[in-house]
Design a protein with these regions (language model features):
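Disulfide-rich extracellular domains of secreted proteins
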Residues: 28-366
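Short, solvent-exposed loop/edge segments of extracellular or virion-exposed proteins
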Residues: 371-380, 424-427
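A surface/secretory-pathway sequence property marking extracellular, secreted
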Residues: 408, 412-468
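Short beta-strand elements of extracellular/lumenal beta-sandwich folds
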Residues: 384-413
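Bacterial Sec-dependent N-terminal signal peptides
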Residues: 1-31
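Low-complexity, intrinsically disordered segments enriched in Ser/Thr together with acidic residues
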Residues: 323-330, 457-497
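Extracellular/luminal low-complexity Ser/Thr/Pro-rich, glycosylation-prone repeat/linker regions
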Residues: 346-373, 482, 489-538
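Short, solvent-exposed loop/linker segments at the N-terminal edge
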Residues: 246-250, 379-388
């Protein structure tokens, strides 16, 4: 929206008086509904996407859409333009409609969250004003379903009897049932025709979170609010509840989707305000090939600098709604373990209304391995001798990108062997074990214990930084561990061909909060049937 200023001295003085008297009210009114915590928050194998379309478009004067006036180089907008309904569905009962495609990764996708937003500019004497909280949605050529926002309507007075509004409602079940493909939204309440002060506009957007078990884990967060940015102003918000991994991310490891109402392709930087219309993430202005740094909010629907074409109508300038996805893994200040993102909006003399933000950041889960080896103190090994010492070494590391928590090793001793008391040592482990340290067998405060359960002897070793008796510690990426203990073969060892012994390491990751497990087996003895041992949880 282009803001016009009076040049007469009296008018300027009056304007200054009004702004001074009501400056506090004006600033606070810019945030119509604040961005609180995320409306969706999860760590899952999957990600998010956002799609939508305009519901109004400018005509060329001959009844056709002004398709060629859009895009980055737009010279006209919806201000004082004749805006008419888009209606693509061919259904008599709808007065407007447009479609866009939900594109999902290959394979099986489960929709975990889907929320539909719609809105526009409307007069309170418009016959559809009372219905602004209701729209219709369908998949492909199926039957329409009614979506009612209830009380979930945000709006602000623009001038006189004209309002900017958005409404929203959960449609997770509907999208999960219907899956990927073309969705049409109809009967969005807006005003048509020509008006100044920004022009008429309308549209819809659908934000979707999906789970796909073939994909890596991601931290997915969705936020929404309703903010008015206008008149050469800036507005800052902070999005909390983020869950960045503990190690740096690559450019493609994090992406942001955002939606805003009423951005104009023809209003950008001026000599008075060279910054133009922008969005900054942690202090860095976001831009790409179709969203210039001085006019990010320009009516585009895009992904990483390319226009999205899977929509009907497929316009370059929606003249009322921006839906843009951008990689933000590098260059936008998302540091390891960040829990918040600072966003700043600015404008030249445009007016726009930021709404949805969604972030997906690839998690860096741990990958903890366990290897087990055994040697005998009798070389060469021809057969297992009576009362022979077997020396077991358990080792491994965290080869993943995230920290492993609560790391515990459990080793169930085969019934044919006898643990050698006092032989348990931690040879190396984070948290101060740079050299071999013998541990007591008692269940006490140190990092190891030996006990018996239902006739089975087992060892528990708590490893990692912060490990104490009864509680495993943390293995950071690239950290390793090594423990060792001894067992004796029985007096009748000549009757054994071999002995198989399995150990297990368990723990959890916080990003996502999932358990992990890895086993290692050591086999000793000439070829023959191993003595099996079943792992027992303690």
């Amino acid at each position: 929206m282009k803001i016009l200023f009076f040049t007469k001295k009296a008018a300027v003085l009056l304007l200054v008086f009004i702004l001074t008297a009501f400056s506090i009210t004006q600033v606070s009114a810019q945030i119509i509904r604040a961005y609180a915590g995320p409306v969706y928050s999860d760590n899952l194998k999957g990600g998010h996407t956002m799609f939508g379309n305009a519901i109004l478009q400018r005509t060329s004067g001959n009844g056709t859409f002004a398709v060629g006036t859009g895009g980055v180089t737009a010279t006209v907008g919806n201000d004082n333009s004749d805006m008419v309904y888009i209606d693509v569905d061919g259904v008599v009962s709808t007065f407007n409609s447009s479609s866009a495609d939900l594109v999902l990764p290959a394979g099986t996708n489960t929709i975990k969250f889907a929320r539909l937003y719609w809105g526009g500019r409307i007069d309170d004497d418009n016959s559809n004003y009372a219905n602004r909280g209701t729209v219709s949605i369908r998949k492909a050529a199926g039957a329409y379903a009614t979506v009612n926002a209830g009380v979930q309507i945000d709006q602000t007075l623009l001038t006189g009897d004209q309002y900017a509004y958005q409404a929203y409602q959960d449609v997770t079940a509907f999208v999960n049932t219907n899956g990927a493909g073309s969705y049409t939204v109809a009967n969005v309440a807006t005003t048509t025709g020509s008006v100044g002060g920004g022009g008429n506009y309308g549209g819809w957007a659908l934000v979707v979170v999906y789970e796909n078990l073939t994909l890596p884990y991601s931290s997915v967060r969705v936020y929404d609010g309703f903010v008015r940015v206008e008149n050469n102003a800036t507005q800052a918000i902070q999005l909390t509840g983020l869950n960045a991994p503990g190690t740096p991310v690559l450019a493609s490891d994090a992406y942001m989707s955002t939606m805003a109402w009423e951005g104009d392709g023809n209003l950008a930087a001026t000599a008075q305000n060279p910054a133009g219309d922008y969005i900054k993430v942690n202090g860095t202005a976001v831009s790409n090939a179709v969203n210039p740094i001085t006019n990010f909010w320009n009516g585009t629907i895009s992904k990483n600098g390319a226009h999205i074409s899977t929509k009907n109508p497929n316009l370059l300038n929606q003249m009322g709604i921006d839906i843009d996805e951008q990689e933000v893994g590098v260059g936008y200040g998302i540091d390891p373990n960040d829990t918040q993102i600072d966003i700043e909006f600015g404008t030249e003399s445009d007016q726009y209304f930021p709404s949805i933000f969604a972030f997906s950041i690839k998690s860096k889960p741990p990958l903890v391995t366990l290897d087990k080896a055994v040697i005998s103190d009798q070389i060469p090994l021809l057969a297992l001798d009576p009362s022979e010492n077997l020396i077991y070494t358990i080792s491994g590391n965290n080869g993943g990108g995230g920290a492993a928590h609560s790391c515990v090793i459990v080793d169930t001793i085969p019934s044919a062997l006898t643990y050698v008391p006092g032989s348990l040592k931690i040879l190396a482990s984070p948290g101060g074990f740079a050299s071999p340290v013998a541990k007591t067998d008692a269940i006490d405060g140190d990092q190891a214990q030996v006990a018996t359960f239902m006739g089975k002897t087992y060892l528990k070793i708590f490893i990692g930084t912060g490990a104490v008796g009864g509680t495993g510690g943390v293995l950071q990426p690239s950290e390793s561990y090594t423990v060792q203990f001894k067992c004796l073969t029985p007096p009748n060892a000549n009757n054994l061909n071999s002995v198989s012994n399995t150990a297990r390491i368990t723990g959890t990751s916080t990003d996502p909060n999932d358990p992990f497990v890895d086993d290692g087996t050591a086999l000793i003895g000439p070829l023959g049937s191993p003595l099996s041992v079943k792992m027992t949880s303690f």
